[in-house]
Amino acid sequence: MIKAFRPLFFIFVILLFAACGTPKTILTRQSVAMPKREFRGAWIQTVGQSRYQHMNSAAMKHYFSEMVRKLDEAGINAVIFQVRPEADAFYKSELEPWSRFLTGVQGKAPDDPSFDPLAFMIEECHRRGMELHAWLNPYRVKTNISNRLAGGHIYERYPERFVQYGNQLFFDPGLPENRSFICEVVRDIVSRYEVDAIHMDDYFYPYPIAGTPFPDDKSFSMYAASQGFSPSQRGDWRRNNVNLLIRQIKYTIAGTRPSTRFGISPFGIYRNRRNDPEGSDTNGLQNYDDLYADIKLWVEKGWIDYNLPQLYWEIGHAAADYTTLLHWWNANNFQQHLYIGQDLKRSIDKNELQTKIRQSREMTFVHGNCYWYGYQILDDFEGVAGMLKTDIHPARALIPAYTHMHDGRPGAVKKLTEVFTEDMHFLTWEHNKRPLQPETAQKFVVYRFHHKEKIDLNRAENIIQVTPDNFFVLPYEGGDKRYIYVVTALDAFGNESKPSRIKLKL
């Protein structure tokens, strides 16, 4: 994320003039109710973390289980879990070594050979009806050049494919073989793990260090001319390198597991208006010019499935006003899936979190938020967990449907039945769930209505459970209260089936 290991250059972002004016197009919803469909994510960062390396596998399982439980209670429905912070792995991999942030030493496996953190997190999220997005950093290899790499690391085999910039080490983005290797890592994850998405954040070309050019002369001289770029077009060439990677990752995912999404969380400013008349009324570092990340192109071309810009600034910030940027992204995302990255600490310090969420919900094309950073929810920083649960997420929400990937509906559940046993009262149903067929039912939504209440499946407050199971345990309320329960199926793309209903007395 933009806070972790950022070079000191970042004073470059705190700039000249107060943002003023509004974008030409302001699109808002006519009314804002509690949304039934809303992305509610939390980033779980592993880079720079020391908490895991002091845990054995049993302790880590308990910690992960409690993490997912607490996030679920706060209304989070998608966990973005960092599994590749430094060309390493929080999962079993034959391509890259175990992460030092997991066990303290790169290449050292967990004490329990059967423990796979990514697989465990997927299971914990899915059993609660939540998504797991596997978060990868594409180019970074070392956050500090003095860090030791495990034997057999790809850098040890091909040091010529890497460059040092400042005090860090990176894959050279200009080399085709590096793009292929990164895609091989993606293919390995998607083929072996039921991740709901592959996620990358704002780290493409590294954040610039004042007075220090990025050392890619060698790859530029090797490839630029043959790719149609002149010596004066190095910026365009760098953008093309990242474009090629993003497109190749998308095709890799689509060819491996078509239901898996690809999401990007870019830095919050695409371009400033002073550099581009279509840019935002801001004065800060830019995706396009400084990180060589043309996020608008990726959205327009359909190379990514969701865009999650990090709008971490305060409302009224002099260089990058939150509200100005929110309106700009709302008007410049080609009506595709758009979520907003929120900084919990900065927002709470300014007493702005609820206002920011309300503003995001007023936007026509914004359909969710993601919180940086997730550990603050777990630690209940300034009471944020309770605020999310009670004030911001008082009702459950389903992930927005990715109809551009598949727009059919799964079959409705059948034989919705009330079952009594000696010690349990529950609903059960049949379905056409097939794990290898993502267009079939993958999880189920349970709604509850009072017996005289109108059945309206658009009311988020009537959702009482999202589950992968084909049963739901019913509460006991004295035996004289009448309800209507409704069950629907969701496919892997979030499309919802027709409802099945049953009348009950609890």
Enumerate the predicted regions with their spans.
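Aromatic-lined carbohydrate-binding/catalytic grooves of carbohydrate-active enzymes
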Residues: 75-112
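Aromatic- and acidic-residue-enriched segments that line the glycan-binding/catalytic groove
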Residues: 89-104, 140-166, 202-227, 273-285
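Substrate-binding cleft of secreted/luminal carbohydrate-active enzymes
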Residues: 292-318, 329, 334-405
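Active-site-adjacent "subsite" loops/lids of carbohydrate-active enzymes
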Residues: 37, 45, 49-62, 134, ...
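Catalytic domains of carbohydrate-active enzymes, especially glycoside hydrolases
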Residues: 62-89, 192-195, 297
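Active-site neighborhood of glycoside hydrolase catalytic domains
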Residues: 177, 181-185, 191-200, 204-281, ...
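Pro/Thr/Ser/Gly-rich low-complexity, intrinsically disordered linker/stalk tracts
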Residues: 387-439, 494-506
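Beta-strand-rich modules
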Residues: 474-496
